A protein has these predicted regions:
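Conserved alpha-helix/loop element of class I SAM-dependent methyltransferases that forms part
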Residues: 33-61, 68-74, 78
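Core SAM-dependent methyltransferase catalytic element
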Residues: 168-192
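A short SAM/SAH-binding and catalytic strip from SAM-dependent methyltransferases
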Residues: 116-133
Length: 192
């Protein structure tokens, strides 16, 4: 859908779609401020994102939250059959592209339980805050059995500690750690 709205059968609300970009935040929705377009990160690269999420082919859906969403178009070209769902307000100005969906969301992700093959994001702070702790639970909820969550540390001296705290929060949700480095952690959903 390029223009219009999506209706929710549960809450009966309507969510606007303009230029192919969905605003799936719960009401009351503030106006989306003008934000710069999300650009692909230098690190991690699109290839690293695909590798750490274990993506070689489709089908499936993968959420890319925040700055990692800048790789959505490149990843859609690298891994056919996967729909990459970029979740960031800075995607509003992007052109439509095959294999890429663009939206913004609130604290609850607009996906069914266990519906995603993977989720990638850059740690914006530590999960010890109430918001990020509930985000770890929300990521766990939406990832399918054997699906992966990859968290990269934001550039700078706080990258390592933030990644370690995210690792602890995701482990507390019952996820298995597949890889743990100073700048990234990858976990796998084993329950469902």
């Amino acid at each position: 859908m390029i223009e219009g709205s999506l209706g929710c059968p549960n809450c009966r609300d309507r969510f606007p779609v303009a230029g192919g970009f969905g605003d799936l935040r719960p009401p009351p929705r503030s106006t989306l401020d003008e934000v710069a377009d999300v650009e692909p990160l230098v690190s991690p690269s699109a290839m690293e994102v695909a590798a750490l999420l274990g993506l070689t082919d489709g089908p499936g859906n993968v959420a890319l939250i925040g700055d990692v969403a800048g790789h959505a178009t490149a990843l859609a070209g690298l891994v056919p059959g996967i729909e990459f769902i970029g979740i960031a307000p800075g995607l509003r100005g992007w052109e439509e592209g095959e294999g890429v969906s663009r939206l913004t969301a609130g604290a609850s992700l607009p996906f069914s339980n266990g519906s995603l093959r993977g989720v990638g994001l850059v740690a914006e702070g530590s999960p010890s805050s109430a918001a990020n702790s509930s985000m770890a639970a929300e990521l766990t909820r939406v990832v399918a059995r054997d699906g992966r969550i990859a968290v990269w540390g934001a550039a700078g001296p706080t990258a390592g500690p933030a990644v370690r705290e995210w690792e602890g929060a995701l482990k507390a949700e019952g996820l298995d750690v597949l890889a743990s480095e100073e700048t990234a952690v990858v976990v796998r959903q084993v329950a469902r």
